[in-house]
Structures are given as C-alpha cells and as structure tokens.
Regions:
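Structural alpha/beta core scaffold segments of enzyme domains
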Residues: 1-213
Length: 213
C-alpha cells in the first residue's frame, strides 16, 4: 500500500472494494476518485476479506508514513486474535406432527449477533421443507465481540439448524431421513423444487445411501 499527498494505491485481495475505497478516503482525507485498488488473487477469502480490519490497519500505517510503501502481513497467531470472529447464534425449532409423521406446524426461534444475517433463518427452513403452518421470530443480541462474514455468511449455521432438525423429525416419524426430506420438498410449491429433488437424489446415489457402513 502506498499513500502520497494526493493518491492512494492499495494492492489487496478484497471482497468489498467499494468499502475499502471509502475507508481509505475517510482515513487519509484523499477523495475516493484518487483511491486506486489493485485487486490481487491472494487465495481464498471465505468472508474474511469482506469487512475485516486488515485493510484499515494498513491504511492507517501508510497514512502515517506517506511516500513509503507499506506491506502488512499478519502472523497466524495475530490472524486469530486481531481479526473479526464468526457470528454466534442459537436456535430453537419445534414442530407438530400428524399421525403419519408429517409436520403440520413448525416454529423457528433464533437469537443471533446483531450484525449477523439471522433474520432469514426462519425463512431458510420454510424455503426447503413444506409445512402448512409456520411461525418465525428472530432476536438480535449484542455479544460485544467483533464479528464478520465467515464461511458463507449465515448459511452454515442455518443449514446446521435446519438439517439437524430434519433428522430429528425423520427419527420421530420412524422414516428414512433421505426419503423424509424428499417428500417434504415434493409437497412444497417452490419453482425450483424439482432441481432440489434431483440434487438430493444425486447426493444419495453418490454416497451410496442406505448401504451398510
């Protein structure tokens, strides 16, 4: 990174270049049109290059040493303690099943960090598996820990909530988890449900589902 009196040049792997340009302009006082990002292929980001503090720290150092190129590289230990953490959250899912084991109602409650994308958690369950009745509620909680987008934003947590719950429902219904999921998808009216069924069938076939371990 190089900051002069009238220009900023940044070489970085960045998933949010506009935010980085804005930060550079704010810190240095140099107009955004004179902030130049040179995006580099620097390995995977997995979210950490989306809104982490690493670019701003380098901008601060370069601004204090104008005219001198600055290359900042964290050690692995610094990386763990100096950047943002994965957002936290908890979820409670409940369902009422009919006499055949199929859900007639589902309730999804989530509590996630106020900066986490928790508002979609309930919809994420409903967008996969059919039930005639749903109730969603999401609560934002301040954990006072710097968090950022990591490993697919909110998808990993929501997938864990949803699929763990589906396994529990299939077990309570005495059904095969794969067939249980397949039927619930088929009962829905999503325009892409056929693609979801094909993907599920393919996963079952590739994993040799149902064979002894």
């Amino acid at each position: 990174m190089l900051v002069t009196d009238d220009r900023v040049d940044i070489w970085v792997g960045d998933q949010s270049p506009q935010e980085t340009r804005h930060s550079a302009s704010r810190i240095t006082g140099i107009p955004e049109e004179n902030v130049h990002l040179h995006l580099c292929h620097l390995g995977g980001g997995y979210g950490r290059n989306g809104n982490g503090p690493q670019a701003e720290q380098t901008i601060l150092l370069a601004n204090q040493n104008r005219g001198t190129p600055i290359h900042m590289l964290w050690t692995r230990e610094e990386d763990f303690v100096s950047t943002t953490y994965r957002s936290m959250g908890v979820a409670r899912l409940r369902a009422a099943l009919d006499e055949d084991g199929w859900p007639v109602a589902m309730e999804v409650k989530t509590a996630m960090d106020e900066k986490a994308p928790g508002s979609t958690a309930g919809f994420d369950v409903a967008s996969r598996y059919f039930a005639p009745n749903y109730r969603f509620s999401t609560h934002s909680v301040a954990f006072h820990i710097p968090v950022g987008t990591r490993r697919g934003v909110g998808a990993p947590a929501m997938n864990f909530y949803r699929e763990s719950f589906m396994n529990e429902l299939a077990h309570a219904a005495g059904m095969d988890p794969y067939q249980y999921r397949r039927e619930l998808i088929a009962r829905g009216d999503l325009p892409y449900k056929n693609d979801m069924i094909k993907a599920l069938d393919m996963a079952a076939e590739m994993s040799d589902w149902g064979s002894p371990l």
